A protein has these predicted regions:
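Active-site rim beta-loop-alpha module in soluble metabolic enzymes
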Residues: 155-158, 164-172
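Conserved small/polar residues in nucleotide/adenosyl-binding loops
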Residues: 211-218
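Anionic-ligand binding region
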Residues: 140-143, 152-154, 171-186
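Residue-level signal for inorganic ion chemistry
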Residues: 10, 72, 118, 159, ...
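Extreme N-terminal starter segment of soluble prokaryotic enzymes
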Residues: 1-3
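N-terminal beta-alpha supersecondary unit
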Residues: 5-52, 185-188
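Conserved phosphate-donor
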Residues: 38-57, 163, 178-210
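Acidic, low-complexity central loop/insert segments
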Residues: 63-153
């Protein structure tokens, strides 16, 4: 199997051009290639496939083999690959995903894509569509008991479920413990990616995220 490894701000995947080859049992392949000790090492596997409704399709699998619906960083890399390797030859493209068709604008310099902007669409806040179990129509700054501690969460979907938790101090957060507890909480039937956010000032936030078995930190 020929592959390309790419990343968007550290969110790395193994990409396979399925215009040229077929991947049998992609769930098993995703588990194998994602292993950072015995495989290639990645957050998952993304297959770039032909599509009847868009310029190409992104078929993604998480590192545990489960199928994913959408990844903003992943789809930007799909767009770069598709242009750089001749699948598309235009700077405005469409990519089919499990969460619908996404539209991307490419910046091309010297024949190669240098930047990609993706229209992720409007955020989904309706609880049943995310999905998150709640008596309320929307979960915005609502309490959730996780491992005996109350966290105030906002639930949103941009193609897959996210829980956003604002905290006063995230430096001492045990993300490897609390991350899986959020991910597998009964309130999230399709599991959840969790972002813990500390506001530093009006221009700066610090985040720690737990995304399907992987923790990472960012600042902006």
């Amino acid at each position: 199997m020929k592959f390309t490894k790419m990343h968007g701000i550290g969110n790395d995947y193994v990409y396979v051009n399925c215009f040229e080859e077929t991947v049998e049992n992609p769930s098993a392949v995703a588990r194998y290639v994602s292993d950072r000790h015995f495989g290639i090492g990645s957050d998952g596997l993304i297959l770039i496939k032909p599509s009847k409704i868009a310029d190409c399709e992104m078929d993604m699998y998480n590192l545990d083999g489960s199928q994913g619906a959408m990844c903003g960083n992943g789809i930007r890399c799909v767009a770069k690959y598709a242009y750089d390797y001749g699948i598309v030859n235009k700077e405005h493209i469409s990519v089919a995903t499990k969460s619908g068709i996404k539209y991307l604008d490419l910046t091309v310099e010297n024949g190669k894509v240098s930047q990609v902007k993706v229209n992720m669409g409007s955020p989904i806040l309706t609880a049943r569509q995310i999905p998150v179990v709640s008596e309320k129509e929307e979960v915005i700054n609502e309490p959730l008991d996780v491992n005996g501690k109350i966290y105030y969460i906002t639930a949103v979907s941009m193609g897959n479920p996210h829980a956003i938790v604002y905290m006063d101090d995230i430096d001492h957060l045990d993300i490897e413990k609390i991350g899986p507890a959020f991910e597998n909480h009964v309130a999230f039937p399709d599991r959840v990616n969790t972002e813990f956010v500390e506001v530093i000032d009006e221009h700066t936030v610090k985040t720690v995220s737990y995304t399907h078995l992987r923790a990472h930190e960012t600042g902006a």
